[in-house]
A protein has these predicted regions:
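Mature extracellular/passenger domains of Gram-negative fimbrial/pilin and adhesin proteins
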Residues: 1, 5-152
Length: 152
């Protein structure tokens, strides 16, 4: 009869977990998503071929606890051209610019989103742009980006 000792795993640092009785709601100014509408065809060197502003409103549920949020603009379908570009498969790349904290959003990474300390709500402003990467393709196009939120 052989016996094997099972490895023992110990969780440490659990005393550093802070439980808060708060929640935050996140509302997109365009609940149906960002719609660029009809875009004329373009040449590969056309630069930005469409731009659409949108905002995200973050609200506390009425509590007074301080907390911050991180966000991940996670690509559900599609491939990235680089950390900040989503290939739209139509000769363009989708980029999202954070106008509140000027920088291009890096997809599939958590980053600072909103500090709710001493605030009941925070509004963030963004611009979504389609930048030409090739000859414009006719037809409908759609990609899904999911906003994941972590409390920190």
């Amino acid at each position: 009869v052989q016996t094997c000792a099972l490895p023992i795993f110990t969780l440490t640092g659990l005393d550093k977990i802070k439980v808060i009785q708060c929640a935050a709601s996140v509302e997109l100014s365009t609940p149906e998503g960002v719609d660029f509408g009809e875009i004329p065809t373009w040449k590969p060197n056309a630069g930005t071929v469409a731009n659409k502003d949108f905002s995200i409103l973050i609200r506390k549920n009425g509590c007074s606890d301080s907390f911050a949020l991180e966000a991940n603009f996670m690509v559900k379908n599609g491939t990235l051209t680089d950390a900040t570009g989503l290939n739209m498969d139509n000769g363009s790349t989708l980029r999202i610019h954070d106008n509140s904290n000027p920088k291009w959003i890096k997809y599939n990474q958590f980053d600072s989103f909103a500090d709710m300390s001493g605030r009941d709500q925070v509004q963030k402003s963004y611009s979504a742009s389609l930048q030409a990467t090739g000859e414009g393709q006719e037809g409908n196009f759609r990609k899904t980006v999911i906003l994941l939120i972590n409390y920190i």
